[in-house]
Regions:
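Active-site hotspot residues in diverse enzymes, especially metal/ion-binding acidic/histidine motifs
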Residues: 1-172
Length: 172
């Protein structure tokens, strides 16, 4: 999960200029990418939201071309990339292993606004359905997205040899 400072460094490494507090006239505009400049609204008051907006505008700079202000498909593509880059299924599992159970705890641990986490859950529900499993080095986890978000570690069952095979092996 990239930090805000890490995203700033990445933008600079890509030759982009970031204006961190731009006075947009519309309160609806949180960030904008034009040519080699990313501007973030001065009205963004939390680092979590600033991180999300910068990552999305950086994604636009890397993957979009032309004017996409009225292109909801490109906006959704950038948003989906953002969900995976800033949180991802493994990020949700790490937060669960750190003790998070409520949505506000997940948002705080993952350094994203709760509204972003809600959008992420809706996106993952649309992409993965109500349940998906993820294998990590800490085990296999089931993530359910409906009716509420839950993470559960799956305990593998032991393989018990069948009686017929055991007798056959003993005879050899």
């Amino acid at each position: 999960m990239p930090t805000y400072e890490g995203l700033l460094d990445e933008a600079l490494a890509r030759g982009l200029t970031v204006i961190e507090k731009y006075p947009f006239t519309s309160p609806r505009i949180r960030g904008l990418c034009c040519d080699d400049v990313i501007a973030l609204s001065e009205k963004i008051d939390t680092e979590a939201e600033r991180r999300v907006v910068l990552c999305e505008e950086l994604t636009h700079a890397m993957h979009s071309a032309g004017d996409i202000l009225d292109d909801p498909h490109m906006e959704q593509k950038a948003r989906t990339r953002n969900f995976d880059r800033l949180v991802g299924l493994r990020g949700l599992i790490r937060a669960f292993l750190a003790g998070c159970r409520e949505s506000w705890e997940f948002a705080e641990a993952l350094n994203v606004p709760e509204a972003f986490l809600s959008e992420l859950m809706a996106n993952y529900r649309a992409r993965y359905g109500t349940l998906t499993t993820v294998s990590t080095d800490q085990g296999v986890f089931a993530l359910t997205f409906e009716p509420i978000f839950r993470v559960k570690r799956l305990v593998p069952t032991r393989c018990i040899p069948q009686q017929g095979k055991r007798k056959k092996e003993e005879a050899l």
